[in-house]
């Protein structure tokens, strides 16, 4: 998957004037130009620096708790760190954002902001159903898998709220194919982009090794 793969979610033909509509894409691409092991080691070396942040802790609905790098996401921006793989990732995100924006709107985007953080998860951790934004200026969000072992990120239709989260998790773990969600296997080097309002969660991390991802928000300017 060296090219961008677009997974399209669109409503069926409306039978009622009050039926909901949706039309969005989940975009994915495998990046072979990032050394994930080197990046993993670098991020782990920065963990204590991030943990030194003690104010404004908020895990943003992920369920990971305040003793995490995730809960400090509002107090640091990973893309200000000068490291070769992060610098490459910034360029790849910019390229993918431009491609996505052009595909959906037919126009180029001239400028956008980028803020990111790292999620370092231990055995037994799971990111709960949440989204990143739904305001009138919300734009795109994404994640990059640095190191993972048999986990999935699941992107849920924002109108599909009839199924409880624990049921959804079991459906995904049992391999149930349901059109209300898209289950994406977390592969080292995978970059994913999606509208910020899309609810998403992960399956449980069952490995003794860390699960490490970089999550980010793009700001429309």
Range-by-range predicted roles:
Residues 72, 77-152:
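Conserved double-stranded beta-helix
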Residues 2-105:
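Non-heme Fe(II)/2-oxoglutarate
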Residues 199-213:
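Ligand-binding loop in jelly-roll beta-barrel domains
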Residues 23-25, 140, 210-214:
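Short beta-strand micro-motifs in enzyme catalytic cores
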Residues 154, 217-221:
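Double-stranded beta-helix
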Residues 119-193, 210:
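Catalytic core of non-heme Fe(II) oxygenases with the double-stranded beta-helix
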Residues 18-22, 115, 153:
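N-terminal cap/leader regions of alpha/beta-hydrolase-fold enzymes
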């Amino acid at each position: 998957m060296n090219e961008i793969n677009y997974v399209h979610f669109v409503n069926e033909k409306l039978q009622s004037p009050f039926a909901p509509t949706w039309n969005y894409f989940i975009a994915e691409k495998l990046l072979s130009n990032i050394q994930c092991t080197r990046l993993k080691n670098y991020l782990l070396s920065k963990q204590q620096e991030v943990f030194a942040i003690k104010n404004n802790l908020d895990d943003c609905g992920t369920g990971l708790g305040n003793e995490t790098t995730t809960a400090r996401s509002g107090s640091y921006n990973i893309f200000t760190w000068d490291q070769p793989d992060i610098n490459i990732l910034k360029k790849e995100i910019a390229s993918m954002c431009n491609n996505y924006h052009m595909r959906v709107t037919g126009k180029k985007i001239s400028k956008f902001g980028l803020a990111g953080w790292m999620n370092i998860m231990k055995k037994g951790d799971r990111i709960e159903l949440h989204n990143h934004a739904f305001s009138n200026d919300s734009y795109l969000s994404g994640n990059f898998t640095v190191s993972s072992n048999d986990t999935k990120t699941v992107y849920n239709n924002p109108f599909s709220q009839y199924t409880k989260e624990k049921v959804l998790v079991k459906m995904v773990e049992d391999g149930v194919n349901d059109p209300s969600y898209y289950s994406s296997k977390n592969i080292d080097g995978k970059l994913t982009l999606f509208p910020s309002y899309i609810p998403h969660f992960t399956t449980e991390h069952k490995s003794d090794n860390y699960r490490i991802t970089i999550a980010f928000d793009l700001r429309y300017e």
